[in-house]
Every structure is written in structure tokens, then in C-alpha cells.
From Swiss-Prot:
It is found in: Membrane. It is a single-pass membrane protein. The lineage of its organism: Bacteria, Pseudomonadati, Pseudomonadota, Gammaproteobacteria, Pasteurellales. It comes from the Bacteria. This is Uncharacterized protein HI_0938. Pfam families: N_methyl. One of its GO terms (cellular component) is membrane. Keywords: Membrane, Transmembrane, Transmembrane helix. It comes from Haemophilus influenzae (strain ATCC 51907 / DSM 11121 / KW20 / Rd). The chain crosses the membrane at residues 7-27.
Length: 170
């Protein structure tokens, strides 16, 4: 008799392994606050860089506005061309088309929150597309006890510092 496995034995073994993995992977893939914050931080950073590039290409001043509703745990960002009327990302219907508004809505809206002294209708910062500068400000993105500090510098740079926060941003 030859040593080896039949096709039926191999298929039964694969079925057992796939059933075991089916139960193990969802438990392993649950998002921790650190993972949630890292994903949200990455998406938000890409949005900010996109708006910065848009401001540079348009040679205009763009506002960045943060809005949040603590009662419903909602928050969002609006980027728009400088205008007397500012857009509210929690109520985008009233936003005029001439401001070319771009909205950022969080991937984890109920698990993350944003903190800043400059909440809608005040802008958090301005991207100057002519000079490639940004008004120096900061805000904090938080998921439970994990925090990330977003810093805007007047030389046009955006920095992200994980698990650090500036007392001026609280």
C-alpha cells in the first residue's frame, strides 16, 4: 500500500481549516482604537494634502472648517474657496456652488472625534495657493484614549504626531 492522501481526505482537511479560519479571522480583524485612529488619520491626511494641492493649482485662498455635533457624535470637515458664506458640512444643502466645497466625512464616525478651538463658522486654517502658506494652527483627532495631533505650519507643511497633543489644541 502506498503512503499518501486521497482527494477526499484532502478536501475534508481543507474544509476543516477553512471553517476554523472563518471563526478565527473576524475575532482577529476587530479594529482596536489604535487601528481605527491610524486608518482615519491616513484618510484625513490625504484629504488635507489634496486640498493643499487644489489651493496651489487654483492660486486662490481656501478655508478649512471643522464642524461637529457632540450630541450625535458626528464630525466633518469642509474645504472651500474663500467666500463671505461658509459651508456647513453637517448641512451641505445650503452650500453655494461658487465656493467649490469639498467635504470630508469620517470612516469611523461614532468611534472618532475631532477637537479644536476653531469650530464652524470659524475656519481652522487657510491654504494660500499663491504663496503656498498655511495659517499656523492645530487640531486633535481622537479614538478613545488614542490621539493624533495635526499641525499646520505657515511654511506650508502639515505634520501628524501620534499619541502627542499640544496643550494649545485642547
Amino acid at each position: 500500500m502506498q503512503k499518501g492522501m486521497t482527494l477526499v481526505e484532502l478536501l475534508i482537511g481543507l474544509a476543516i481549516i477553512s471553517i476554523a479560519l472563518n471563526f478565527a479571522v473576524p475575532l482577529w480583524k476587530t479594529d482596536s482604537p489604535k487601528t481605527i485612529l491610524a486608518k482615519e488619520q491616513h484618510r484625513l491626511y490625504l484629504f488635507l494634502r489634496q486640498i493643499q494641492a487644489r489651493a496651489e493649482n487654483s492660486s486662490e485662498v481656501w478655508f478649512l472648517l471643522i464642524n461637529r455635533n457632540l450630541a450625535t457624535q458626528q464630525w466633518c470637515l469642509t474645504a472651500q474657496v474663500k467666500n463671505n458664506q461658509t459651508c456647513d458640512c453637517l448641512n451641505p444643502i445650503n452650500c453655494p456652488k461658487e465656493v467649490y466645497a469639498h467635504f470630508y466625512y469620517p470612516y469611523f464616525p461614532n468611534k472618532t472625534m475631532i477637537q479644536s478651538h476653531h469650530i464652524y463658522p470659524k475656519e481652522i486654517t487657510r491654504f494660500d495657493g499663491i504663496r503656498n502658506t498655511i495659517v499656523t494652527r492645530c487640531f486633535i483627532l481622537q479614538a478613545e484614549n488614542e490621539r493624533t495631533l495635526f499641525l499646520f505650519f505657515n511654511v506650508g507643511s502639515i505634520r501628524v504626531k501620534t499619541n502627542q497633543f499640544d496643550s494649545a489644541c485642547n
